[in-house]
């Protein structure tokens, strides 16, 4: 397990600007108490009820839960992704396009695009999700950050034809799939790798065994990839820290695990 304290830098200033804009936008119609309660409810759904299937869109059915996801959850996802960009040296990837599967608000792909190597400006974004609100929010994220991208309302199992210098990112989304579609996704990712794609799978560190993860890790490593567990100590904006504490949560240390597969011939 790798641990690193995160310091202020130019990339996090972009994070700070995005967070403030998003937080201000969503708290125009919500009080601090309402956002705190929504964050607790959403946390309960994602953390304590992962073993129970939920109807599509159930987690984001209310304005409060959408606000919590767009501000609190997305902020922590960005901060973890920024740590991975440093540790896995993802900024060295020469990318034309980042395809984010189950993109949510698009922050993880955006964090990567802002720092990835490109001769023609930041990598273009393609976000795939089954939630219309999430796709709309992803577009807002990208526009605010000066990124270009398009969204597709479909299952994350179905992604566009892969070309050279494409990256496929699945951040906190593979675990949400049923077993059948998840197996199909892995087959499609293997094909994408053979076509030259960079692949990154990011998930929370599980409190209990997750059978699919071990199987995926074995196959990714057989293809030359790596499996890692990470933790970092992020610098939290004050509103985020206050919401986190009031919700009875403690994200002073973020933890995640990854499967990372570079194109053949890349070291």
Model-predicted regions and their roles:
Residues 166-180:
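A short SAM/SAH-binding and catalytic strip from SAM-dependent methyltransferases
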Residues 131:
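Conserved SAM/SAH-binding beta-strand->alpha-helix loop
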Residues 2-55:
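N-terminal auxiliary segments of SAM/dcSAM-dependent transferases
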Residues 57-84:
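Class I SAM-dependent methyltransferase Rossmann-like catalytic core
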Residues 105-120:
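Conserved SAM-binding loop of SAM-dependent methyltransferases across substrates and taxa
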């Amino acid at each position: 397990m790798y641990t690193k304290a995160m310091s202020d830098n130019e990339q996090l200033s972009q994070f700070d600007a995005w967070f403030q804009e998003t937080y201000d936008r969503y708290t125009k119609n919500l009080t601090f108490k309402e956002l705190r309660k929504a964050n607790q409810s959403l946390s309960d759904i994602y953390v304590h009820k992962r073993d129970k299937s939920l109807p599509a869109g159930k987690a984001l059915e209310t304005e409060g839960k959408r606000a919590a996801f767009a501000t609190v959850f997305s902020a922590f996802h960005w901060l973890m992704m920024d740590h991975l960009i440093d540790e896995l040296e993802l900024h060295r990837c020469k990318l034309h396009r980042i395809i984010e599967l189950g993109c949510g608000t698009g922050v993880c792909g955006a964090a990567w695009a802002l720092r990835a190597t490109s001769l023609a400006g930041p990598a273009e974004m393609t976000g795939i999700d089954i939630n219309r609100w999430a796709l709309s929010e992803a577009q807002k994220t990208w526009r605010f950050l000066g990124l270009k991208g398009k969204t597709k309302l479909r299952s994350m199992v179905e992604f566009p034809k892969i070309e050279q210098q494409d990256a496929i990112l699945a951040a906190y989304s593979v675990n949400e799939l049923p077993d059948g579609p998840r197996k199909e996704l892995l087959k499609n990712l293997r094909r994408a790798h053979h076509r030259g794609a960079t692949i990154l799978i990011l998930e929370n560190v599980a409190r209990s065994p997750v059978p699919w993860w071990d199987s995926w890790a074995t196959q990714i490593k057989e293809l030359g990839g790596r499996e890692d567990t990470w933790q970092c100590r992020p610098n939290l904006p004050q509103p985020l820290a206050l919401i986190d504490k009031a919700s009875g949560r403690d994200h002073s240390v973020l933890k995640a695990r990854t499967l990372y597969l570079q194109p053949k011939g890349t070291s």
